[in-house]
Design a protein with these regions (language model features):
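Non-heme Fe(II) oxygenase catalytic core, chiefly the N-lobe of the double-stranded beta-helix
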Residues: 1-178
Length: 178
């Protein structure tokens, strides 16, 4: 298990050489802990996408083009030296694709390829654990609440820059209630 009851580390495993039992074990661990960390993999796109398919149904990210036609589920998220605005998710608490009304992915997979020194500071939290620690009075006040999730906001700026570079027509904000 990781720090603060969020996540688990899986060590001494090669994702390129897994049988279905090991894949199921990884998926069960992910479901139990919410986040898993598997280091030192350096997967090629084929292996990465196949692993994703082995633990769930990949969904095409609606805001960017996939790596190519063969790998529509893989997106390159990068921070360029010329970027002046906040990057995807940088400095803001967020939930990936929570602004989708339907077909929200169950999991998000990240793989760092080039992480500058002093970067790579993604932090994970558990809404389930936070809720469980609330006083009963607050729980009763929010139990029937509905959240409004939007793809707009300060962190959208870098995404809009990438859309422009890729020749993607600037996308409208997406919003959903859950």
């Amino acid at each position: 298990p990781g720090k603060n009851n969020v996540g688990a580390y899986i060590n001494n495993i090669d994702l390129k050489k897994l049988d279905q039992n090991k894949k199921n074990e990884i998926k069960n661990t992910l479901n139990q802990f919410g986040v898993i960390f598997i280091k030192e993999q350096n997967l090629d796109p084929e292996t990465y996408q196949n692993f994703a398919k082995s633990i769930g149904q990949p969904v095409v990210y609606p805001r960017l083009k996939g790596l190519d036609e063969k790998y529509p589920f893989i997106n390159v998220i990068e921070r360029k030296p010329s970027d002046k605005n906040l990057s995807f998710g940088s400095s803001w608490l967020h939930q990936d694709t929570s602004y989708l009304a339907n077909d929200r992915p169950r999991y998000t997979m990240l793989m760092g390829k080039e992480i500058p020194i002093g970067q790579g500071n993604t932090i994970f939290s558990s809404g389930f654990n936070a809720y469980e620690k609330l006083p009963e009075k607050i729980k009763s006040q929010i139990n029937d609440a509905t959240g409004i999730f939007s793809s707009a906001g300060p962190i959208a700026v870098t995404r809009l820059e990438r859309e422009k570079e890729m020749g993607i027509k600037s996308s409208e904000s997406m919003e959903a209630e859950h």
